[in-house]
Amino acid sequence: MKKIGLSVLISLSVLSGLGVSSCTEIKRGEYAKGSATIFCDDGFKNILDEEIEVFEYSYPEASIIPFYVSEQEAMDSLMANKTQAVIVTKELTKEQKEYLKTKYKRIAKSECIAVDAVALIVNKNNPIDALSMDDIKDLLNGKITRWNQLAASDTTNLTLVFDSQGSSTVSYLRDKFLPAGKKISDNTIAFAQKNNAEVFDIVKKDPNAIGVISVSWLGDNLQNAKKVPMNERMASYENQTDTVVSNLTTEVKILKISNPTEENDFSPTSYAPYQVYINSGDYPLFRKVYMISTASNSNVLYSFYTFVTGFVGQKIISLTGIMPYHVNRRVVELQTNKK
């Protein structure tokens, strides 16, 4: 039987008028050399690892040293001038920009590089397929603690696992679902891990766990790309005429999310965090990802900043399963033959 698959085809072309450059344009400059650090929320580790590897392959005299930390630690490091670049999910306030300018003579540049989604995952043998936004709110507030409260027959207690305190994922869910002053860690079924990788591994092994994780950790395409020799990967990344098909992992079950409203309360549709639904806004748990730099134009970080917001950098992001920000997007659902 022919069914509509949930893979997404993205036609990539960099938006004009944004002041971003291609890989070859950076080569004409003098500043794709030297070393610098960047602090990144751990949720976006997969993205940054590949961005750095490709950038350093293109510019052998450049070295970008990443530190994967909580979003709070990344922002604190930027404000203390311990680094001149971060990848986070919030922009600097006017007061923060003024502080950096007055204290350290730093002018902050900020660019949205992607639209990420927060996913809820369970063991692939778990019978639960979908949650509503109200379910998530009750989970985070401790009102739901057993599987049979989520339409399953199992009366076993569930556990909620997430990455470290201070991460962008924790902040996003706290601000969206919890009353002021309340923390996810106040919930007796919630357990913090060191990073997203640990969340993924726990859910793979534990049928009673619900994991909260960035969708960028769930894309299959980037992992497959890493198996290809770098020269072939580079040629593919620089190809401006091809398309990208984004698929998510099957090692865990990725829950669909519904957002009941007055209009659809009786039959709300549940959506998985595929790019087509992130792009349309139908998947309700999404947020922007920003790269912020205080480096001067003569610093290697400026070249890296330009690279990430250019065509190659944006194409790398598209392979992670989240939406690159600086591209024209033509998204279609692909037909696949399934029994």
Each model region followed by its residue ranges:
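Exported/periplasmic ABC-transporter solute-binding proteins
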Residues: C23-Q72, D76-M79, A114, V122-K339
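Pocket-flanking alpha-helical
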Residues: E71-Y104, L218-N221
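A generic, residue-level signal for flexible/boundary positions that often mark functional hotspots
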Residues: V86, I107, V122-N125
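Short, glycine-/small- and polar/acidic-enriched structural segments
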Residues: L92, R106-C112, V118
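Short, flexible coil/linker elements and helix-boundary hinge sites characteristic
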Residues: G17-G19, K105, N337
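Generic hydrophobic, helix-prone segments enriched in Leu/Val/Ile
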Residues: K3-G5, G17, I64, L100, ...
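Bacterial Sec-dependent N-terminal signal peptides
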Residues: M1-A36
